[in-house]
Regions:
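Inter-helix linker motif
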Residues: 140-141, 160, 176, 195, ...
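Tandem repeat domain/solenoid detector
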Residues: 173-174, 193-199, 208-210, 224, ...
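Alpha-helical repeat scaffolds
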Residues: 238, 270-274, 305-312, 339-347, ...
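Pentatricopeptide repeat
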Residues: 80-84, 109, 113-114, 129, ...
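N-terminal targeting peptides
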Residues: 1-167, 171-175, 182, 195-199, ...
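C-terminal interaction modules of eukaryotic adaptor/scaffold proteins
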Residues: 440-513
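Ankyrin-repeat interhelical turn/loop motif and analogous interhelical turns
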Residues: 161, 196, 231, 266, ...
Length: 513
């Protein structure tokens, strides 16, 4: 046994020369029974959209005046778009200054000005926003109005530029303009997001003195800010203040509360709000439904997870891949492997097939050690022209390894590189098999010829596969050896498979010891 392992390692470390790999076959044997790899499924071509030409009937000519106006509008729109494109191009140049550009142009339309503001936000040039606003509004005094100040204060608040927002707020009042509900909301929410709740509450008090009544949106922003800073007790106080000020929480507020309590892992509070909503016959938003489902999956409460999963399924609420993986982990943890098949089929029927859902269906039959079940899924994938990938391949390899079926493991490994490139999980499967007595010399030589070990390490297998089967000895040894390195050593070079394997050998003395 030991001599076989050392022979495999010697084969891996032979670097005399690299032969040109033989030409690959386009397809494997179509035999699936026995868990051989299916054919190299082609990617389905996308349909080209049909092109339709709209031909105007000559029997119904348009009025001459209407045609002329339409043409003029098109020309003006074209030139407006060209001027805006030119302005943004000048603004994107290194060292450009919007103040200089505005002076050069003389003035900008409101469309051009707000496009510049959006550009500056996207480019993180926040300090220039208020400067160019001051210059632009002074070119035409009618621009000093509540709407423009409301928009600029909202931008500043959203970007956390509260000192600039305060200046604009004071300047607005100095012009005799009355701050609107939107302006106060921007100030309160901006301070709240930064965690400065003292100032946020000052503006909440000031708006009431100015006879601007807070609305639920005002308090909703505060609630969201409290949750961001994990100040959940203050959320309760905020709700009481809402009710005392004649602004009872509405459906949006309750949905927000449930999402924030869910995110914070406050299960009892989340459920309490949910029961309140049920008693008030309020609608549960799809994002709230997903948040509740995520919470139950995170806590592993399977009965409630399934209850809200069925509700999401019935309402056609899409679920993200991460949530689907969490649900799969709950089923795996409870040894309910057949539910993975049901989960994959249900979601495929509702939203369409994905690689993750095919993966779950394969895993279901893999855990049940059902060759017939896996064959059935592989045949279905072949009929649907599902492109083959390393996740599917590794599930089959891991199943062979779990069964200690070295015959089919060898066949599958020999066919593997005809369709997909191995990743670190595949390499780990081979070394774990060698540790169990498998003769991996042929596979190591084949991978050496294709120069796999000189390539950067990649992890392309879906994480749910690792969760299902575990990391195995090889990956655990890799992590252990890697953790012994200094942080700068880990990032100073691109890690190849050779680098990583040699590190493991150096750390362990020899693999498998």
């Amino acid at each position: 046994m030991k001599s076989s392992k050392m022979e495999c390692v010697r084969t891996l470390n032979q670097h005399n020369h690299v032969k040109t790999p033989p030409a690959r076959r386009s397809f494997f044997s179509s035999t699936i029974n026995g868990l051989l790899f299916p054919p190299n499924f082609p990617i389905r071509p996308k349909r080209l959209p049909s092109l339709r030409l709209s031909v105007r009937s000559s029997s119904s000519p348009q009025p001459q005046g209407s045609s002329t106006e339409h043409t003029t509008l098109l020309v003006e729109t074209f030139h407006e778009h060209r001027r805006l494109k030119s302005l943004l191009k000048r603004l994107s140049k290194t060292g450009s200054c919007p103040l200089i550009l505005l002076r050069e142009d003389g003035d900008w339309s409101k469309e051009h000005f707000w496009a510049v503001v959006r550009f500056l936000r996207h480019a993180s040039r926040f300090e220039e926003i208020l400067q160019v606003f001051d210059l632009w509004k002074n070119i035409e005094k009618s621009r000093i109005n509540e709407l423009n100040y409301s928009k600029i204060i909202k931008v500043l608040g959203e970007e956390g530029l509260m000192e600039e927002a305060i200046l604009s707020f004071k300047e607005m009042k100095s012009y005799g303009l009355n701050p609107t509900l939107e302006v106060y909301n921007s100030m309160i929410h901006g301070f709240g997001q930064k965690g400065n709740f003292a100032d946020a509450l000052v503006y909440l008090h000031e708006m009431r003195e100015d006879n601007v009544a807070p609305e639920t949106d005002t308090y909703d922003g505060l609630i969201e800010a409290y949750a961001k800073h994990k100040m959940y007790d203050e959320i309760g106080m905020c709700l009481k203040k809402m009710k005392l000020n004649g602004c009872p929480p509405d459906q949006i507020t309750y949905n927000l509360l449930m999402r924030q309590f869910s995110k914070g892992g406050l299960l009892k509070r989340m459920e309490s709000v949910y029961h309140t909503m049920i008693s008030k016959r309020m609608h549960l938003q799809s994002s709230t439904l997903v948040a509740m489902l995520e919470t139950y999956a995170r806590f592993g409460i399977m009965d409630k997870m399934e209850k809200f999963y069925l509700r999401a399924l019935n309402t056609k609420t899409p679920l993200g891949d991460d949530l689907i993986r969490k649900m799969a982990e709950v089923y795996i943890g409870n040894y309910m492997f057949s539910r993975l098949e049901t989960l994959g089929v249900d979601l495929s029927t509702a939203f369409g097939e994905t690689d993750l859902l095919w993966c779950l269906r394969l895993l279901s039959h893999s855990f049940l050690l059902s060759r017939q079940g896996m064959d059935s899924i592989l045949q279905e994938m072949e009929r649907e022209n599902v492109p083959w990938n390393v996740t599917f391949a590794n599930i089959i390899l891991l199943t062979h390894l779990k069964m200690k079926d070295f015959t089919h493991l060898r066949i599958s490994l020999s066919q593997l590189t005809h369709s997909v490139e191995p990743d670190i999980v595949t390499v780990g499967i081979l070394f774990n098999a060698i540790d169990m007595g498998f003769d991996g010399t042929g596979t190591l030589e084949a991978w050496q010829r294709m120069e796999l070990f000189y390539k950067a390490v990649e992890m392309n297998t879906d994480p749910v596969v690792i969760t299902s089967f575990g990391k195995g000895n090889f990956l655990q040894n890799c992590e252990l050896a890697f953790s012994t390195l200094e942080p700068e050593e880990r990032v100073k070079k691109i890690w190849t498979y050779n680098n990583l394997i040699n590190l493991v050998l150096k750390h362990k003395g020899s693999y498998g010891q």
